[in-house]
From Swiss-Prot:
Record key words, sorted: Cytoplasm, Glycogen biosynthesis, Glycoprotein, Manganese, Metal-binding, Transferase, Vacuole
Gly residues biased stretches: 788-798
Protein name: Glycogenin
Enzyme's top EC category: transferase
Organism: Cryptococcus neoformans var. grubii serotype A (strain H99 / ATCC 208821 / CBS 10515 / FGSC 9487)
Keyword Transferase: yes
Length: 926
């Protein structure tokens, strides 16, 4: 019984599925039933998914055969890259066609990218008796193109092709020129080598080019295509661009050919391929969509209403792949060549049952421990002989005598591969991985943290840590003179050159030439106990000692009394009581025991307090009872360290003497330039009286601010208010200070009576003489009450000041009615409101010299004015405070009168004198 014929195609990737389906339906259209041939597809399950194989079976392929992929390998990559088609790396799988000799007599092979245009089944008989027939290639016509072939398979051809693949590798393991036996790296070069005049398969039979037309943009002969185009039987779409690559962007039934047909009709051939695809492969809904069905409302049928569906589901339906009993009997009668339509079978190589390519066999590698052992043991000794047998094992038989002539086998050196296995347990120390877990020390309680810092010899077991055994250098290295300086265990100190000049000198007892002193500084080792400060944090803290220090050395009797009162001090400490049991303390308690080293030196503490302007946390002007000279004057302990009244008075007087020596800038209340001493002394007396009133500013840093302890000793101060602390040589007049803030109102000026004073807590605004030659307004002293930071000047004091201001202001208006007129015209000025924010007053020190130059002229004009012009004889022009800014135009454009006592140089000189007195006072007390 003769074997059937078959059309065969190959599918090594799922991307060629549209081409294989179009090829199947084109053959069906060109060869209607009944057909005397089969259509077979070779697939590689390793590279093609199961869904693609299922589509081929459902589409109508008579048989789907699974085969193993044959790759070009690294040797064939050179030819594929030269051809520019690296995607053809599995093209050698086409050689499985010659293994189909037991199943088919004649094969017509077509690539999946070929479109048949005319019937070609007559080639099954017309090509006889040739074994191999093909069409010439357009690139090299002396060679055939393997995309279309007529083959009568033979087992000898399969064996010869396998031999050529193996012969491509030389004896030295390197591939010759072409690589794997194919000059292009793929199947076409290998087949042209075998089916040639010099090949083992004989010369190939040439078919007409019309059976394998390869249109491309690189090569075409338009006149020949126009003359013989109607005779084309197959169109082969070679190249990387296939017709189905434009499937996502090409709708069904659309043609790319527009207008007149081109001489190169490549687009019309593409349209013919899509015509077959749209007819058989593309879904029917895309060709003729049913709008009513697409937008119909779905209906749900109840399960109890579908009796027919239940009956159909109950019926036993055999799978398509499973044959019933009758088909199995028929298959046994017809033989193994009878297959059911759409059947799938496999054709593994070399008798294997798995089509997956086998992995390369790994060379057995000996463990590293055996390699290390083999380096010191003779090769003839077996490793198993070195392993002692178990105690209960039977005695081994005596080994056979070793022949005199033994074969010495060289073991393959093995190297550990980190990508495949973990490090061996018996590896050298440089390859061993430590398996240890370390806990965070800061997460443990304080009682356990001390164990981490203990000496290792007392707490660490001796067997816990073992130094690894490092390999030694081979004898060949140590005995070689070339490695002599590197193979010695101890380095030669003579080879070390000195870096610094003093390193050339050796240690000696003296400092003479050629010797240098031996260093006395010793650095602690790494495992030494921690410093005492760190141990205080680790171990339970003991209660801190109570100590009080005075800023100045007190009287001997007072020192003894204080030492007796405190019980414990820096000079003499009482015997300590037994410490309480250890307890866990917090970080705040641990940090409370710290103190600065310089806190024990009272001279440094007093100097810091004086330079910072504070004593015990208060202002320099205030008096504090805190006697600790370095700022830590709070008494620790329970009721200890309380001073006696006599000691407090003595310390307070000492602090007052040291604080009252702090003067300010020497400045009087009024300018004394050109004034009589009588008027100056009178105003100085008024200034003294105003300073006796306690007034504090809002920032608490006023020169008159006092503390609560100063008010307790107020009686002694009131008795000697006119001459305070005359016994102190460093004391300077307290009221010779910078004036308080004064302001001048725009319309209301201060009065001309020098003897009147403003109410307590108010600001005095000084103006200019009334009815001067330049039309200035009369001056009137207006009390302006303000509130202090501590509220002393507020409340009733402010209301009293406001009442006095109103009465004084109205009397002044009745006596001087003409002062209501404005400088610009007859517009009446409104009554000033005291709650209006006054502008800032500034003083230009750079312009003080120019103002001082016109001082003499200002005095002459003020004294030379007649009495009938309304000049004020009690106040001169140089004594008036002139505001800056927009107020300079109100007072005739004159600048502020310069006072010699407010000069910058005078203030700088006085500040230097004050600093010198402070330094002398602090050093004298220290």
């Amino acid at each position: 019984m003769s074997l059937p014929n078959a059309f065969v195609t190959l599918l090594t990737t799922s991307s060629y599925l549209p081409g294989a389906l179009v090829l199947l339906h084109a053959l069906h259209d060109l060869h209607p039933a009944p057909r005397d041939f089969q259509i077979v597809a070779l697939v590689t399950p390793e590279t093609v998914d199961a869904a693609t194989i299922g589509e081929l079976r459902r589409a109508g392929y008579d048989l789907v055969i699974g085969v193993e992929p044959i790759g070009s390998g690294k040797a064939g990559q050179v030819g594929l890259e030269l051809m520019g088609r690296p995607d053809l790396n599995f093209a050698l799988t086409k050689l499985h066609l010659f293994r189909l000799a037991p199943f088919f007599s004649t094969l017509i092979y077509l690539d999946a990218d070929i479109l048949p245009l005319r019937p070609i089944s007559h080639l099954f008989t017309s090509t006889a008796p040739h074994v191999f027939s093909a069409c010439p290639d357009t690139g090299w016509p002396d060679c055939f193109n393997s995309g279309f072939m007529v083959i009568r398979p033979r087992e000898s051809d399969w064996d010869g092709l396998k031999g050529m693949l193996k012969d491509g590798e030389g004896e030295d393991g390197l591939y010759r020129e072409a690589g794997n036996g194919s000059f292009d790296g793929a199947d076409q070069g290998l087949l042209n080598e075998w089916f040639s005049e010099d090949g083992g398969g004989g010369d190939w039979n040439r078919l007409s080019f019309t059976y394998n037309v390869t249109p491309s943009a690189a090569y075409t002969w338009a006149p020949a295509y126009k003359r013989f185009g109607h005779k084309i039987s197959n169109v082969h779409f070679i190249g990387p661009n296939k017709p189905w690559t434009s499937l996502p962007g090409r709708p069904a039934g659309v043609s790319n050919v527009k207008g007149k047909e081109n001489s190169y009709d490549y687009l019309s051939l593409i349209d013919r391929w899509f015509a077959v695809y749209d007819k058989h492969v593309r879904p029917a809904s895309a060709l003729d969509p049913d709008i009513s069905r697409r937008f119909a409302v779905p209906q749900t049928i109840a399960a109890w209403d579908s009796h027919a569906n239940q009956a159909r589901a109950a019926a036993t339906v055999l799978p398509e792949d499973k044959l019933d009993l009758s088909e199995l009997k028929a298959a046994t009668e017809r033989g193994v060549n009878a297959f059911k339509p759409g059947q799938y079978t496999s054709l593994p190589l070399e008798g294997r049952v798995d089509l997956i390519m086998p992995k390369p066999k790994a060379i057995p590698r000996a463990p590293i421990s055996q390699l290390v052992a083999s380096s010191t043991i003779a090769p003839s000794v077996s490793p198993s002989a070195l392993t002692p047998p178990p105690a209960d094992a039977a005695p081994a038989p005596a080994p056979a005598p070793v022949p005199t002539q033994t074969e010495q086998k060289t073991a393959q050196p093995s190297v550990w591969d980190a990508q495949r296995s973990s490090p061996p347990a018996s590896a050298p120390p440089e390859m061993s991985v430590p398996h240890a877990y370390y806990h965070n020390a800061w997460e443990a309680p304080l009682s356990q943290q001390s164990s981490y810092y203990a000496h290792p010899e007392s707490h660490r077991p001796a067997t816990e840590h073992k130094e690894p055994e490092y390999p030694t250098l081979p004898k060949e290295v140590t005995g070689d003179s070339w490695y002599a300086r590197f193979a010695t265990s101890t380095p030669d100190k003579r080879a070390i050159s000195a870096v610094f000049p003093w390193e050339e000198k050796s240690y000696g007892p003296g400092y003479g030439h050629g010797s240098r002193p031996k260093p006395e500084r010793v650095f602690p080792k790494g495992e030494e106990p921690l410093p005492s400060l760190v141990q205080q944090l680790i171990h339970p803290l003991q209660p801190p000692s109570i100590s009080i220090q005075n800023p100045t050395p007190p009287h001997p009797a007072h020192s003894q009394h204080q030492s007796h009162a405190t019980g414990m001090g820096m000079a003499g400490q009482a015997p300590k009581s037994p410490s309480p049991p250890p307890r866990h303390v917090s970080m705040v308690e641990a940090m409370a025991s710290y103190k600065n080293v310089w806190d024990d030196i009272p001279q440094i503490g007093r100097y810091v307090d004086i330079m910072s302007g504070k004593t015990g946390g208060k202002s320099v002007r205030g008096v504090s009872t805190r006697g600790h000279g370095h700022g830590h004057g709070h008494i620790q302990g329970h009721g200890q360290g309380q001073k006696q009244p006599q000691a407090q008075t003595h310390e307070r007087n000492t602090s007052l003497h040291s604080l009252q020596s702090v003067p300010g800038t020497p400045r009087t209340q009024y300018s004394t330039f050109g004034k009589s001493p009588r008027l100056t002394n009178a105003r100085n007396l008024e200034r003294r009286e105003s300073f006796e009133q306690p007034e504090d500013s809002a920032d608490g840093d006023d020169e008159n601010s006092t503390s609560a302890s100063e008010e307790e000793g107020g009686k002694s101060r009131e008795g000697n208010s006119s001459k305070p602390y005359k016994g102190n040589k460093k004391y300077k007049d307290r009221w010779a200070q910078t004036d308080r803030v004064k302001t001048v109102d725009e319309t209301v000026q201060t009065q001309t009576h020098a003897g009147e004073e403003a109410a307590a807590g108010g600001l005095k605004m000084w103006g200019l003489p009334h009815a001067s030659a330049h039309g200035r307004k009369s001056s009137k002293e207006i009390p302006f009450p303000i509130g202090s930071g501590n509220g002393r000047a507020g409340g009733g004091g402010q209301r009293e000041a406001q009442t006095q201001h109103q009465s004084t202001y109205y009397e002044y208006q009745q006596q001087h009615p003409h002062s209501q007129q404005s400088r610009q015209g007859s517009m009446a000025s409104p009554k000033p409101e005291l709650n209006v924010r006054l502008p800032d007053y500034s003083f230009d020190f750079k312009g003080a010299t120019s103002h001082a130059q016109g001082l003499a002229q200002a005095q002459a004009q003020a004294h030379g004015q007649p009495q009938g012009q309304g000049a004020n004889p009690n106040l001169n022009a140089q004594h008036r405070h002139r505001p800056s800014g927009s107020f300079s135009t109100i007072y005739g454009g004159r600048g502020r009168v310069w006072d010699p006592n407010t000069d910058v140089e005078v203030r700088r000189r006085d500040s230097q004198e004050v600093l010198a007195r402070f330094m002398q006072g602090s050093l004298g007390r220290g």
